[in-house]
Amino acid sequence: MMSISLIWGIAVVVSCCIWFIIGIRRRKVGEPPLDNGLIPYLGCALKFGSNPLEFLRAKQRKHGHVFTCKLMGKYVHFITNSLSYHKVLCHGKYFDWKKFHYTTSAKAFGHRSIDPSDGNTTENINKTFNKTLQGDALCSLSEAMMQNLQSVMRPPGLPKSKSAVWVTEGMYAFCYRVMFEAGYLTLFGKDISKTDSQRAFIQNNLDSFKQFDQVFPALVAGVPIHLFKTAHKARERLAESLKHKNLYMRDQVSELIRLRMFLNDTLSTFDDMEKAKTHLVILWASQANTIPATFWSLFQMIRSPEAMKAASEEVNGALQSAGQELSSGGNAIYLDQEQLNNLPVLDSIIKEALRLSSASLNIRTAKEDFTLHLEDGSYNIRKDDIIALYPQLMHLDPEIYPDPLTFKYDRYLDESGKAKTTFYRNGNKLKYFYMPFGSGATICPGRLFAVQEIKQFLILMLSYFELELVESHTKCPPLDQSRAGLGILPPLNDIEFKYKLKH
């Protein structure tokens, strides 16, 4: 009579054989090279997740510029030749770029699908974003952000005795605190009936946001939030504060949120909590990448004496041209849209900081079987497969960016000091050379506001404060690879700096 262990052993072997026979995808003629990985369902996910850049470089050396990997039950076709990016986007009629994003949003934030085709709402969310994050609406949003940044950085009633004192703080913690509060107030307004407790309210939301955001990569990967009790409670607290009954009590709510409240109330079947969670999506999208992007921009600027000098001269010149004067009385600074757009040095600093820290994954799902025509050849793609671009491969390509791991503040400036828009690879001009915000239909709708608020932050830091790193020769902190694929990677550890108000 067979032992229990032998029976289990046979069962495992049989299961593995069945999986090998029917569970492994076979490469067909005309398809890209295929790597199923060794682990059922996960495929190559663990290796990819540990270091996506090195994983893709290794696969590129083995298979060429186009290859397929099984990741979490999905088959992902990676296109790694930056000269082919524009060709991918030309196949837009075969792609469903919404499916992945809508599914991920519902999974991470806990609301029903916001895809109009699923019947829960008829709101076109992209149309809403385009209407409220461009043109005159962007001007109003930027003006509010500038006011809130100054209020947070230089709170009214600050004793003069404290103005000349050096304050030492973690730079990432500082950027997190300032950008979260100013951004929250800009989008969701202020409760003027609770002025004294406003800061405590923001701090509580900041703490909850950190707890929720910490597990966000796991949620995107499909891990149920109920396994993270602290993060689950934090998400529910954040959503509770964004219920319409609470937002109606706040003043100076942005046009974006006011319009979304109206459309949620008139076009959706969401309950109060689900409506609030769709606003939580916007809170997360406005903070999760902007905060680390702000840190990297400030850190790289302070760390480079040449960048600090060039940026300070540009900001001082812009303020003088605008008739703005800094004084010990703390006069507010205001630069309009045209003036903010005419700061090529700051633009280049921000772009270079994001080039070195962005690790987004541009994803599109195939709506049907089709043939993808690229510079490297033609490939057959199956329905429901995923096409993916990983721009970090391009951002760190030495053929495009010489000495790619070195911060060069003027990398995006031409010889005349204006924005440089021409880059080459193998002698061929690139149509896409900088993609921290995505591309095509999936490009981030809030990218213009994000860049402007980082620029405003840098302007105010240079205008109001003397800035120094505690250790002048501080090394650049490593990137937190656990968030690879989600956008801008935060530092793995904080960096101490010190600041004091200028006189």
UniProtKB/Swiss-Prot annotation:
Its cofactor is heme. It is a single-pass membrane protein. Pfam families: p450. It is found in: Endoplasmic reticulum membrane; Microsome membrane. Pathway: Lipid metabolism; bile acid biosynthesis; Steroid metabolism; cholesterol degradation. One of its GO terms (molecular function) is heme binding. InterPro entries: Cholesterol_7a_monooxygenase, CYP450_sterol_14alpha_dmase, Cyt_P450, Cyt_P450_CS, Cyt_P450_CYP7A1-type, Cyt_P450_E_grp-IV, Cyt_P450_sf. Heme binds at residue 444. Keywords: Cholesterol metabolism, Endoplasmic reticulum, Heme, Iron, Lipid metabolism, Membrane, Metal-binding, Microsome, Monooxygenase, Oxidoreductase, Steroid metabolism, Sterol metabolism, Transmembrane, Transmembrane helix. It catalyses: cholesterol + reduced [NADPH--hemoprotein reductase] + O2 = 7alpha-hydroxycholesterol + oxidized [NADPH--hemoprotein reductase] + H2O + H(+); 4beta-hydroxycholesterol + reduced [NADPH--hemoprotein reductase] + O2 = 4beta,7alpha-dihydroxycholesterol + oxidized [NADPH--hemoprotein reductase] + H2O + H(+); lathosterol + reduced [NADPH--hemoprotein reductase] + O2 = 7alpha,8alpha-epoxy-5alpha-cholestan-3beta-ol + oxidized [NADPH--hemoprotein reductase] + H2O + H(+); lathosterol + reduced [NADPH--hemoprotein reductase] + O2 = 5alpha-cholestan-7-oxo-3beta-ol + oxidized [NADPH--hemoprotein reductase] + H2O + H(+). Its EC number is 1.14.14.26, 1.14.14.23. GO terms for biological process: bile acid and bile salt transport; bile acid biosynthetic process; cellular response to cholesterol; cellular response to glucose stimulus; cholesterol catabolic process; cholesterol homeostasis; negative regulation of collagen biosynthetic process; negative regulation of fatty acid biosynthetic process. It comes from the Eukaryota. The keyword Metal-binding applies. Induction: Up-regulated by fasting, returns to ground state upon feeding. Up-regulated by experimentally induced diabetes. Down-regulated by insulin treatment. GO terms for cellular component: endoplasmic reticulum membrane; intracellular membrane-bounded organelle. Its main location: endoplasmic reticulum. The chain crosses the membrane at residues 4-24. Belongs to the cytochrome P450 family. A cytochrome P450 monooxygenase involved in the metabolism of endogenous cholesterol and its oxygenated derivatives (oxysterols). Mechanistically, uses molecular oxygen inserting one oxygen atom into a substrate, and reducing the second into a water molecule, with two electrons provided by NADPH via cytochrome P450 reductase (CPR; NADPH-ferrihemoprotein reductase). Functions as a critical regulatory enzyme of bile acid biosynthesis and cholesterol homeostasis. This is Cytochrome P450 7A1. The gene is Cyp7a1.
